[in-house]
């Protein structure tokens, strides 16, 4: 999953396309995972919501800083470009927004797990319906054990995991197994 935005890139045209920002983006494994896993989950939830007369949901990706701050940082820009690629390929399923929590901390109040939880400008929030996950920016990168300097980008995998976590939670599945030696009276 982490093919398109890693810093040590195999630049063969078979796997990567250079985009207008100079990054190699839109890797097929990343897009296929979203297309084959998250899209059906979103469609299932939205079909149930439509039957109840409710509005359609999208996966909301919220950056906890002003747009200019996100673009100014090389690290946050990698994450942003990955999310923008998803939005470009799946505009009906992904929305991207920016909340400047330094000036409007109450805008993200509902994403705090407890009243003592802190959110920072380096957080990225993935939301779908009532489910959300808050990720720190450093989660999308690989670092050495004794250093905080990132040496590789692992964002595609973490973005995919976050999106699958919030979309799957809205459509829970229960399984019952029988005939494994238990009594079935």
Residue ranges and their predicted role:
Residues 1-185:
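Short, surface-exposed patches at the edges or C-terminal ends of soluble domains, predominantly
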């Amino acid at each position: 999953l982490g093919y398109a935005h890693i810093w040590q890139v195999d630049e063969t045209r078979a796997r990567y396309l250079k985009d207008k920002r100079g990054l190699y983006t839109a890797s097929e494994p990343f897009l296929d995972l979203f297309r084959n896993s998250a899209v059906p989950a979103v469609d299932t939830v939205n079909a149930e919501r439509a039957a109840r007369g409710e509005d359609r949901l999208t996966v909301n990706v919220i950056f906890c800083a002003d747009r200019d701050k996100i673009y100014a940082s090389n690290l946050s820009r990698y994450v942003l470009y990955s999310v923008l690629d998803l939005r470009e390929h799946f505009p009906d399923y992904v929305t991207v927004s920016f909340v400047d929590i330094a000036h409007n901390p109450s805008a993200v109040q509902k994403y705090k797990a407890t009243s003592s939880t802190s959110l920072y400008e380096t957080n990225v929030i993935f939301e779908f319906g009532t489910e959300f996950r808050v990720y720190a920016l450093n989660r999308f990168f690989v670092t050495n054990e004794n250093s905080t300097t990132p040496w590789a980008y692992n964002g595609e995998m973490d973005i995919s995991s976050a999106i699958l976590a919030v979309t799957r939670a809205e459509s829970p599945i229960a399984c019952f197994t029988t005939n494994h030696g238990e009594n079935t009276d």
